[in-house]
Regions:
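Short, well-ordered beta-strand segments in beta-rich or mixed alpha/beta enzyme
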Residues: 2-8, 39-66
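Glycine-rich beta-strand-turn "strand-cap" elements at beta-sheet edges
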Residues: 2, 40-48, 76-95
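An amphipathic, aromatic/His-enriched active-site/gating alpha helix that lines ligand/cofactor pockets
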Residues: 24, 28-37, 55-89
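Residues at secondary-structure transition points
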Residues: 13, 20, 47, 65-72
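N-terminal first-folded block
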Residues: 3-30
Length: 95
């Protein structure tokens, strides 16, 4: 299993727009083969920090996800709403 944590530091006046556009991404992604879970989470202490937490069956499923139309159209747009570059970490399950 592969887990991805993609943290975005969103401009204060763009948080709602980010969430609305992310909704399209989540709705399409959870239907993909190999997607175990995929959601957007908001930091309880700083509402401008929005984080996608994803679980994939394997690396192949994750790589296929990156070729989808919704990924290629939504992700670049979401990055324009960030006030600074985010953090992207990928993990493999050990135990």
């Amino acid at each position: 299993m592969i887990k991805v944590v993609s943290k975005h530091f969103v401009k204060e006046d763009k948080v709602e727009e980010f969430i609305e556009n992310a909704k399209r991404m989540v709705e399409a992604t959870v239907k993909e083969e190999g997607c175990i879970s995929y959601g957007l989470f908001q930091d309880e202490n700083d509402p401008k920090i929005l984080t996608f937490i994803e679980e994939w069956e394997d690396k192949e499923a994750l790589e296929k996800h990156k070729t989808t139309e919704h990924f290629k159209s939504v992700v670049p747009f979401l990055k324009t709403l960030d006030e600074r570059p985010g953090d992207l970490n990928t993990y493999k399950k050990l135990i």
